[in-house]
Amino acid sequence: MPANIKIALDCRDINIATTGTHTYLSELITAFNKQHNNQVSFVFIKPFIGVMPGNNAFAKLIRHFQFIFYKQITVPVLTLINGASVLICTDYVAPVFTPGFKSIVVFHDAFFWEYPLHYSALWLRMFKAAALAGAKKSIAVIAPSEYAKKQIALHTGINPDHIKVVYEAPKTFAPIKSQTNPQSLAQISAPYFLHVGTLAKHKNLPLLIEAFSKLDKHFKLVLVGGAPSSVHNNDVPNIMAAIQKHYLQNQVILTGYLSNADVANWYANAIGYVFPSYNEGFGLPVLEAMRYKLPIIAANNSCLPEIAQAGALYFDPSNANQLAVQMQAIVNNTPAIIASLNAQPAVLQQFSWDKVAASFVAIALDGLKNASKHA
C-alpha cells in the first residue's frame, strides 16, 4: 500500500441532482478538503459534458447511454489518470471494471428494490443491474443507517458484512442575516408547521394534511420541495386532492424547490417540524430541524427513531388522529415536547460531516490493507 493514498470522488451529481444526493456530495467535498494531509489526498471527478436535455423518449435514451458510458468508461479512466487508489461513488453505481484501484459505493436506501412501481421499468432494470455489479466489485457498500443496512441486505442480497454504516449529518446552512424573502414575508404571518422534502409517495403527505385539518384553523402547513424526478413516484395529485378534500387551499403552502437560504428561512420561523414518512434511509431533515431547535414529530418507523432518538416525539404513520394529537402537543408546549427539545443537542453532537469524511478514509485504508493481504 503506497505511503500517500489518493482518493477519487465521483462528483457527477453535483451538477445534476437537486436534493439529497447533491447535498451529500457537496458536504462530502467540503469535509474531504479538510482531510488533506501527507497520508491522504483527494481528487474530484466530473463529466466533461452535461446530460442530454428534454423529456422525450430519445432524450431519455441518450441520458441512459451517457450514464453508462460515464460510469463504466469515463470514471475508471479519470481515476487511473489521476493516480487514485480508491474511488468513491455516492449514487449507488460504481464501475464494474476497476483496474489499478478499488471502489466504495453508497446506497442511500433500498427504495429501488422496495418500490419498483415508482420507477420506469426499463430504466430500473438497467440501474439495478449496474448498481449490483459495481457493489459486488467494491471493497464496501456504505449505508446511512443500521435500518438502511438491514433493508439493503434484505432486498439486494448483498452480504451484510460488506455493508458499512456511515451516518450522515445535517446540511450546512449559511446564517440568516435578514428576513427579506418576499414569499416568506407574505406567508408566515400565521404560525406554521413545516415539512421539507420531495413530494414523493413514501413521504405520506396526504396523511399529514388530514392530521393538520384537525387543528385550529389559524395555523398553516408549509410543504417545502417539488415533485420527484420520477413521474411514477409523484404524489402531487394525491396531495392536491387531500388539500381540496379538507378545504385547506388557504392554509397549506407548497413552495416548490427553494434555495438553501430560503429553506433556512422557513426552518427559522416554523413552530414545529413534522416527518410522516413511511420509509427513509436516513431522514436528514430531522437533524436540520434540530439545528433550528424545532420541536419534531416523526413517524415511529424505518430509521427515524434511530436518527432522531429522544429529540423527537413519534406517531403511527397510518394514524392521522395520533399525528394530530402530537402536533397539538407542539402548540401546547407539553412537558414531552420540552424534554425532546432538551435532548436535541446531545443527539446533534453525534453527527458531523467531518466524521463522515473520516469514516470514508478509514474504510478506504482498511479496504486497501485487506486487499494487499490477499494480493
Each model region followed by its residue ranges:
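Carbohydrate transferase catalytic cores enriched for Leloir-type hexosyltransferases
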Residues: M1-A375
